[in-house]
Amino acid sequence: MKSDKKKIYLFIAVVVIVGILTTLSSFALWTVASNNINVAVNTFPPLEGNIRYTEGHSILAGDLPLCLNYFDGINTTFTIGKESNLSEHLVYASMHLKTNDDSYLAYADAINWQIRTASSASPLASGTLADFAVGSNIMLDNIEVTTTDTSYTFYIWVDSTYGDANALAGLTIDLELWMEVRYERYNVRPVVNEGLIPVVFDTTSGTVVKTIGKNDGDWYNYDKQKWANAVLVTESSRSTYLNTSGVTVSESDILGYFVWIPRYRYKIWTTGVSSSGNEQEIDIIFEGKNETKAVATQAGGYYTHPAFTFGGTQLDGFWIGKFETSGPASLPKVKPDIKALVSQNISTQFATALKFAGGTQSGSTVTFDGNSTYGLTSKTDSHMLKNSEWGAVAYLSHSKYGANREVYINNSSGLYTGRSGGNVSGSTPINGTYTDQTSTTQYNSYGFYTWDGYLLNYNTNTRSSTRNLNKVASTTGNIYGVYDMSGGAYEYVMGNFANTIGNSGFTTLPDSKYYDVYSSDVFTGTSTTNINFCTLATCGGHALNETAGWYSDSSRFVYSSSAWFRRGGYYNGSASGIFYFYYDSGTNVANFSFRTCLSDA
């Protein structure tokens, strides 16, 4: 059919909005008037007045011919740049599209869109409306805003090769197109719960833990794999460290180390089951809890990680224990160089994690009264790590903000926290590190390296003078990451099949926000086949199907007889790793530990 013989009439309502969302608790809205009806530029500090923006037309209406090429479609162009005083800061703009009616659904695969710049030989992003559900917000593209103004044009048209063109005559489509602009540093700003003390590590001579102000720019830099760290200290020493900077924190005063995992969206690379050999850098964009959630459903779109939705609360991030939880159970800690707390069933592990913030469980209800021992108040929720929260850390680790490779293994058979074999699982023979030894065994009681990179004297718990910080087994490959996520003890997480209590010890499962559930209505197979039923809605971000088999880590799903997930693998397993997952019953086992997480209550 020739395009001049048949025209399709589309009404496209395109609302272009620029919104800058940060983790600041309060802000004033700044609106720039537009020459075009219904177009405004909305922003918040610190970008107020520092973003240059020229709007496209708010209303596009007209005859849209059937065509083969984008340039015959209808379009809108907008231009964006930043002022020179932001030249040292990363600013990103994401383009979003939302459909407001369902009239197009039967023909969605015929309606094409593209985003281009004047200089681009190929589109920056493209697709069809088949990727959209009514009312869903789809991120079309994410671009860095530079000091050079750049124009972007959005095109939409009907494919002339579509078989049933007559059915499209007179079709009206209501779409919204807008932008969100983010100042990256503000989107990773940690929420410092009362009792937490921001720290950095001075490794110039030994390892010295020092306090730092929460607004100090040297506290963290995720662009350089320097994740924000904080500690909990004893009640008697707390006043020495609170609200200080540069004060050395005595190791004996520290009760727990925690690492901030900031809220983000990630780019979907598969909706199926991955496998070994398909490892790739995970594309992550930090976001604030007040930003519109990304809810793409297809590869190439962005999806807000589910770990940052805690029940009905949107989180800017959470604090994860830097190490596996250690004992005693009556006074749990999160520290290096201590044996992990093991031999607890899942219900006891859950109750132990609650102790940090004075939590108790009654029936399914969990309440917090605070705990002066750790300095946490009732405004903090301390809980056992969920499966999705494990996934959030794993994905951040495998992005440009983390090690972006296989995490080294903790090869301590004594289950000492923070230890390292100096390499990945299956690649840590004793004679490869200790050249005066002949054994090819992959582990020993204490591991080979400490959390701060010191080589241990062979098969002892004493440090040598040899140090290599590149040998540490953290999610960043340096001292600022999370440890013990490959090897060490197995770690139970709160991930459960069909609300099955099993051998966990629970009488009643806690509130559903404390665990991820994998429904028997969906997962109807076995430990080896259930992964095939994963979808973005059920498993997205959990480091299950999306990363299955990465680095040959074991992949076995929960099912009716073994209803609880364990993660990370064991000190001696070649299939251990941050993407390892396996089923278990939830019972107490002598080599199973767990992880503690802190978030807003």
List each language-model region with its residue ranges.
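Short aromatic-cysteine micro-motif
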Residues: 248, 252-255, 287-485, 600
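C-terminal, structured domain-capping segment
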Residues: 72-91, 96, 139-186
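Extracellular adhesion/glycan-binding regions together with long Ser/Thr-
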Residues: 2-6, 61-70, 121-151, 155-159
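N-terminal module-boundary/linker segments of secreted carbohydrate-active enzymes
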Residues: 187-301
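Short, polar/proline-rich extracytoplasmic segments that appear immediately after membrane translocation
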Residues: 2-69, 169-175, 180-186
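A solvent-exposed, charged loop/short amphipathic helix patch at secondary-structure junctions
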Residues: 325-351, 503-532
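Surface-exposed interaction patch
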Residues: 22, 31, 68-126
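C-terminal, surface-exposed recognition/capping segments
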Residues: 388-391, 412-446, 451-452, 456-462, ...
